[in-house]
Amino acid sequence: MTSSSLFREGELGHFCLNKQEMLHLNVTNPNSIYIEGKLSFEGYKSFNIHCYVDTGASLCIASRYIIPEELWENSPKDIQVKIANQELIKITKVCKNLKVKFAGKSFEIPTVYQQETGIDFLIGNNFCRLYNPFIQWEDRIAFHLKNEMVLIKKVTKAFSVSNPSFLENMKKDSKTEQIPGTNISKNIINPEERYFLITEKYQKIEQLLDKVCSENPIDPIKSKQWMKASIKLIDPLKVIRVKPMSYSPQDREGFAKQIKELLDLGLIIPSKSQHMSPAFLVENEAERRRGKKRMVVNYKAINQATIGDSHNLPNMQELLTLLRGKSIFSSFDCKSGFWQVVLDEESQKLTAFTCPQGHFQWKVVPFGLKQAPSIFQRHMQTALNGADKFCMVYVDDIIVFSNSELDHYNHVYAVLKIVEKYGIILSKKKANLFKEKINFLGLEIDKGTHCPQNHILENIHKFPDRLEDKKHLQRFLGVLTYAETYIPKLAEIRKPLQVKLKKDVTWNWTQSDSDYVKKIKKNLGSFPKLYLPKPEDHLIIETDASDSFWGGVLKARALDGVELICRYSSGSFKQAEKNYHSNDKELLAVKQVITKFSAYLTPVRFTVRTDNKNFTYFLRINLKGDSKQGRLVRWQNWFSKYQFDVEHLEGVKNVLADCLTRDFNA
């Protein structure tokens, strides 16, 4: 009774799908029937899924990621499915007697087969016959359970929740709420672009992912342990010995379990090193969610005594520019990334630590060494260098991005083959495949927009109004700075608090300071979704300056003429700059804003909007290179590196940039 089918009934155990039938697969459209069901499993929170009803399909099909692994069993007989190119694929797993609730009523499904189709759950004709008569209206359908009609509303906006980490997050001991799924778009997709979703190609991705995933970061079968590192002392004769800590009975028990796990995995060994640093257990938010404290070694003394690694980590905004115009993403997380880097014998001795069980040293790079992020970044960039047009890596986080799903299949396959070649181990439960919306480096990237994930805002609001000391204040300002792109006039907002961090300022926290922090948190009710400009969009910056602050906005004008906000930026003038003439401050504001947005503005032609009437004149005039005009000459030369047009913006119209420099307390 629907316009599309997954499997057409043929001979027993043999089904066929043609390309036109693929047209509406995994799409929400008026001719498709989606209903909401609820699944409950022992040890898991109950959760909702959107089920696709297809009377032309002979079987009920479910994703492996919404039914616990232990409930899947080998099918007594392989089911062969013929797909569009006449090739056969096998369905080998079945879940028996599955109970699903629809409209509050429990329905039992004798057999549900496992297959990744891009849909969480497909209800086939066998279910419709079992609970017949099946009736449908414009906005609802009906099945019959024990001669009673059960009315079920259709879902007009369907979502898919299945991903490798979904069930892990739904365990009862997990504090993670059910994460909203990915919208099943109503756009009509070219059949060829959906082709891989149920062909052997998608299965190849799943199989390849299984090959490179493990719970052991130095898996003896999968890891090639090609990543090596060496840590050197500044003074080769120096011995680092930090006094051991005392531990509670509970901590001793926690250490015993973790030390045994690390020994069993081959990550640490007993040590006779003359160096030693103390280990301790921490319980932050992530640890509380897992219900398990995490062992950390205090390597402060070692870090001060060893030579650093100067390999730079990628700039966040430069990474974002690579995602411009991309519509489909996959992300991967290296399993305990630093532990995949093997240390030489002398370096292992430097990592020696003390705990209740004795003296141990790491065979791999431990968390806490200052060199660790740079070492791992270098190795990952070396491995993935050939995939840099569609893949980027930030330490142990990998994201793959594409314009179409067919391209994306090829890109993901290429990245996973590189990972397999080098023996890099990934985390299966943190893998996200073929998503329109994805979280990466604390940002939510969704259909051409980006904003910080909810936990960033939650972290800001978790800070008490009264901050205890300078370190506490630094942490609060650090979280604000992380989200500076999304907070207008941040420079002005944080200035009254920043002065308290000066070395010559004695710590003194007053009630007015607490009120100010409270006001900041109140004004940050949510983060805006900012636009990620496409390569063909025309870019515009709007700038403004006040006596003490500068501000700017990056906007993009699409082909339809609509202008969207991409980024905010603001800052404060240095003490010497505060003495500049107002015209010079306006010029400096433009310079600062272009610098902040340079990753987007090079090498394209863009527009500068400013309410400074003298800016165009400044760019044209032939300045003398004497001491009075030396700074302006340097600025002229600096501006000449960029290609832009200037639009004069009346002050009353310069609302966006002006709001970044206006008094926060006004």
Curated annotation (Swiss-Prot):
EC number: 3.4.23.-, 2.7.7.49
Organism: Figwort mosaic virus (strain DxS) (FMV)
InterPro entries: DNA/RNA_pol_sf (IPR043502), Pept_A3A (IPR000588), Peptidase_aspartic_dom_sf (IPR021109), Rev_trsase/Diguanyl_cyclase (IPR043128), RT_dom (IPR000477), RT_RNaseH (IPR041373), Viral_Replic_Matur_Polypro (IPR051320)
Active site: 54
Name of the featured protein: Enzymatic polyprotein
Record key words, sorted: Aspartyl protease, Endonuclease, Hydrolase, Nuclease, Nucleotidyltransferase, Protease, RNA-directed DNA polymerase, Transferase
Hydrolase recorded as keyword: yes
Catalytic reactions of this protein: DNA(n) + a 2'-deoxyribonucleoside 5'-triphosphate = DNA(n+1) + diphosphate
Database matches in Pfam families: Peptidase_A3, RT_RNaseH, RVT_1
CDD domains xrefs: RNase_HI_RT_Ty3 (cd09274), RT_LTR (cd01647)
Family stated for the protein in its record: Belongs to the caulimoviridae enzymatic polyprotein family.
Organism superkingdom: Viruses
This protein's domain notes: The polymerase/reverse transcriptase (RT) and ribonuclease H (RH) domains are structured in five subdomains: finger, palm, thumb, connection and RNase H. Within the palm subdomain, the 'primer grip' region is thought to be involved in the positioning of the primer terminus for accommodating the incoming nucleotide. The RH domain stabilizes the association of RT with primer-template.
